[in-house]
Amino acid sequence: MTQPIRESSKQARSSGLCCPVVELRQYTLQPGKRDVLINLFDREFIESQESVGIEVIGQFRDLDHSDRFVWLRGFRDMTSRAKALTDFYGGPVWKAHREAANATMIDSDNVLLLRPALPTSGFSLENMKRPPVGSDDVPKNLVVATIYYFEGPVAVDFIDFFEQEFKPAATSLGARVSAYFVTENSENTFPALPVRGGENVFVWFSIFQDLAAYENYVAALSQSERWRDEVSGQLESYLGRAPEVLKLSPTSRSQLRG
């Protein structure tokens, strides 16, 4: 039986995976301001966060919501998260640009705090090189984040099901599963930035060559007997409500891209 063991920062470094703690952040922005924030973020808020120990994993445009900006960042553990966020938000770069950033936002509190479901299920970023400041070539790749909601903590048997049945089936139909996480239930160590409490989620990320490849995958799901007969019903039996699917287009400087 699969064991959802909490990964230490030492394990993460030795395995080349990122990260033991991950934030999935969805911002609702003022109409027409998404590219304004992305330009500011990609120029000012990547290296400045990484200089204090934050891993900026990826930044995205949500293709289904023109005024939503989604991004991911990671930490070694909850203690270092508190220090890193204190250093960044108390530092000169954020102070210089916070008014411009905040002016683009309606809401920035839609945040899920996550940890890898398994020691091997974090992001592998070793071969993903971030383009330099000033790059404007937007990748064609699509990153899809699927959020499953549960009535209680994600059970070990669901992780077994995902590993042994769901993941092989999805892979065979064209999905490249990148990483998967469950809720990190530790107390928020930086309360100045709220996170969503009381949630029990399993979030998995997949990467596609482009939007057309994802649409082909969705079509293949509906035509697959294996999916209909062996996977879909089991999946629905675990879930507390309908899944949430985020179709995410990486920005020009997103590290997570393809």
Can you say where each PLM-predicted feature lies in the sequence?
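An amphipathic, aromatic/His-enriched active-site/gating alpha helix that lines ligand/cofactor pockets
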Residues: 2-17, 36-58, 64-65, 74-117, ...
